[in-house]
Amino acid sequence: FCSVLLSALSLHSCTLDEYNPGAFTKEALATSIDGYETLINQCYFAMERFYYGAADWMSLTEGDTDLWTYKANESTSYTQWFWFFAGTSPNTTYTNNWWNGTYDGVGACNEAIALGDKPPYTTEEERNAKIAEARFLRAVYYFNAVEQFGAVTMLTEPVVTETLTYSPTRTDPMTIYQEVIIPDLRFASEWLPTGTHATTTTPTKKAALGFLAKACLQTYEYGSTEYLQEALDAAKKLITDCETGGGKYNTYMYPSYSEVFKESNNWENKEALWKHRWYAGADGHGSSNGNYKLNRNDEYFLCNINKFGAREDNQETRLTWEGSITGIFMPTQHLLSLYVQKDGTLDPRFHESFTTEWNANKNYTWDESAVHMYDKEEAVIGKALNEGDLAIKFIMPQDMDYATEKQKEHISDYLLIDYHHVYSDDNNNVNMNYAYTNVTGNYKNDGTNENQFRHYYPSLNKHNSSNYYVANASKQRNGNLNATFIMRMAEVYLIAAEADIYLNGGANAAGYINKVRERAGANPLTGSITVRDILDERGRELCGEYCRFYDLKRTGMFKNSEYLENTHPDLARFFHPNYALRPISTTFTATITNGSEYQNPGY
């Protein structure tokens, strides 16, 4: 019975309808509290399967932006995620999971909301708290749907046989914000419980208020100012609570940035407004993707350190915080430049957020081939590195020891990577070629050789983990048990700052943004704060946290290619304003009678 029910509830409908011929079963199930909460649990199914922390959601929310390029700046792979298809015909099926996931999730939420009067809760507070879970999740599904796809079909009631259609219509984003997203988040912020710092996956009041502020601010993208005051008000509720002890909403911001992503603070992270983690153990697991496909974010950001001979990818190292899985996200020159302060020093968040040194995990001796490839002097041949020794070091011009390290780049027994070897400040991009100092054989000084150093770059460590369930050691199948933070308190200050610019000309914006900067140990911003200042600050604070694609849309940076030409010119050459929306999966559009009309422009 349960397996049949779960299959029915998670049915992928090719008509955007959640029609289930066994709907009476759900009505019967909803007449008991346990049964109804089974329906509530089903609302989470698509979220945990496809969204925050799941495979490629990071790419949909952070890729194709100014902050990231594909590993080593290669433009022949993952083109839909990082290169706006790189000038080729767009892939129109890669969004299939999220398109189906939206309507699986919305369908489950609609069922739970519609049947909310059935279970015998003793108080309306208990009943509404459960309904609020479904309404919060429905808002999040629709929020992501409209920001990824634009106008989508708006469904707010369970679909019955009589309403099935193979010619669906699309509803514009603002209408969905007005009629579903914002009302659902208002309801959720009123009725969800406060929870504790240990509350995970289940949303709380602070999650609802945070997403209400986020959603209201996002409507500015559509030329609306109607909800900006509500965005600011919701943000201020959380800020006031945070600065007075968190007594009402349980909000908190760590005194130092370094505490936010400490693994010891992960499961009960106080700053996270909403977080999710998976369970896996010998007694079972809670992931529909399998017991080793849990939080996948730890797999995405590490540079290819295994390309150097003192490193290797092995099971033992995979279980350490340092890790060994080569990722797909490389920071752009623009992202790294954001951490250079006006006085020439580095924002402390750079070295907190990015790993720039790696130790050897095997014994290694430099041979002639490696010495020549990495532009070392002949004297380095035969030098040895022992396991645990410094193996790779990336240096920034602003580092205190930069000049000293720079002098050793050709003679050090570790691989020394100079920022200027990898990135070009003149061209705002990655150097694909390199001019050798120690010329030998095919390694020349005319800049025609492939740049081997571009494989090594600062690697975001916000999602690093040493907390794994080992599902199969021989196959290196390890499930990351750490939570992913979907939204945290620092973002609320930046939402308030941006809303204040739109509403009040930024009179209070500096106060909000400098709270975040002061906590990080960065120099305070002075003078008038602009939207670009906010966008830059969001890059520093929130890179790799599911925000950037939506940030660029909201602030108008996808209206034309000008912004990308100045921040990520390699990406700008492939940009078209149509690509601010993803393609609706042609797996779906092929099943309806108005597929061409339903599809987004440019696909």
Predicted regions and their residues:
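Short coil/turn linking the two alpha-helices of tandem helical-hairpin repeats
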Residues: 146-147, 151-153, 196, 215-224, ...
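Bacterial Sec-type N-terminal signal peptides, specifically the leucine/valine-rich hydrophobic h-region
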Residues: 8-11, 142
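Flexible, polar/acidic helix-loop-strand segments at domain edges
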Residues: 330-485
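Long, intrinsically disordered, low-complexity segments
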Residues: 14-16, 44, 71, 102-103, ...
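Conserved, well-structured interaction surfaces
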Residues: 32-38, 45-51, 73-149, 168-179, ...
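Membrane-proximal, proline-rich intrinsically disordered regions
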Residues: 14-60, 593-603
